[in-house]
Amino acid sequence: MVSESVQARIDKLLNEAREAVAESNWAVVLNRAQNVLRIETENEDARALLAAAERAFEMPS
């Protein structure tokens, strides 16, 4: 279990990542998801966002 302040930081990063998804800003999604996973390695939301960003980078434009 993480502290309240750490959880607030995780929530902020995840919200920023979700906003970036809406803008197709995959570099930000990737960055924010990786930051969450550095704090909480098993965070499922961050893992899903990271996977989405990685798929987006693999797609031809």
Can you name each region flagged by the protein language model?
Residues 3-10, 52-61:
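Alpha-helical linker/edge segments of TPR/alpha-solenoid repeat scaffolds
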Residues 8-35:
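Alpha-helical segment of the N-proximal tetratricopeptide repeat
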